[in-house]
Amino acid sequence: MLTVEKRIISRNFTRAGAGRKIEYIVIHYFGSLGTAAAVANYFAGADRQASAHYCLDEGNIVYQCVEDNNIAWHCGTSGGYVHPRCRNANSIGIEVRPYKLDKTTAGSAAARDWYFTEKTVDNLVEFTRALMEKYNIPAENV
């Protein structure tokens, strides 16, 4: 069973309030070899211009960085949007810890040897299902 530990950041997100409608869940991987706790700490740092609502790995703790009713900066606008309707304003972002076969290319998010442990995937499925139920999000919006 997963436990959510709040590590709410004080910057790098937008306050939205109770009226925010959550329609999507966006799943990312870190692009680095750090733990979920380390990435949560990274988001809390200076002017990152990025954040996610949650960070998880193979451990039993999910770190919450941004309250669900606020807007994390995870979908990106620097290169435009990929999805026609999913935006930071209507989604929850989850960052997931990857592993890498060739650690000498760890700085390359485009490398094709990133992978997830079975426990990490199990945690992600469990946590994503809980969010889907909480916000009535259909599978096609994940």
Where are these regions (language model features)?
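Short glycine-rich phosphate-binding loop at a beta-alpha junction
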Residues: E140-V142
